[in-house]
């Protein structure tokens, strides 16, 4: 019962005109999380071009450079409010779109490798998973504790 009431609360806050409902759910969770005092130092931007996070592309292979310059985007980028530096990237992986699509899995792998090269922390949230809010809070707490 409490599970369905939580879903109804989220559903009531959703914009039904969005392309991906899974990303809209994460957006709502981020809004809730950042209202908490311990996380109010963070802000997020949705749909950021990966290229915009990289100061330079020197570390990238030619394939990675092409990928980045071909409008590769990130679902959510969490920034520190104070200095606007990137704290965390969140990618929402829809099961149908990702698991059943070898090309998309390859793009996800390349994105992971690029984020790792530039030491940008990231969190992948599969839409067939659960406990997203807790996973996000754990990732943010790790940033605060470091």
Predicted regions span which residues?
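Nucleic-acid endo/exonuclease domains
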Residues: 1-146
């Amino acid at each position: 019962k409490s599970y369905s009431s939580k879903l109804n609360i989220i559903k009531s806050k959703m914009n039904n005109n969005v392309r991906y409902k899974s990303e809209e759910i994460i957006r709502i969770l981020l809004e809730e999380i950042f209202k908490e005092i311990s996380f109010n130092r963070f802000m997020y931007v949705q749909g950021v071009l990966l290229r915009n996070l990289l100061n330079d592309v020197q570390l990238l292979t030619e394939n990675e450079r092409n990928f980045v310059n071909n409008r590769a985007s990130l679902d959510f980028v969490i920034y520190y409010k104070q200095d606007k530096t990137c704290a965390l990237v969140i990618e929402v992986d829809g099961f149908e779109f990702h698991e059943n699509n070898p090309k998309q899995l390859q793009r996800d792998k390349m994105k992971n490798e690029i984020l790792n090269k530039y030491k940008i922390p990231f969190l992948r949230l599969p839409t067939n998973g659960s406990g997203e809010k807790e996973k996000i809070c754990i990732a943010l707490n790790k940033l605060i504790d470091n």
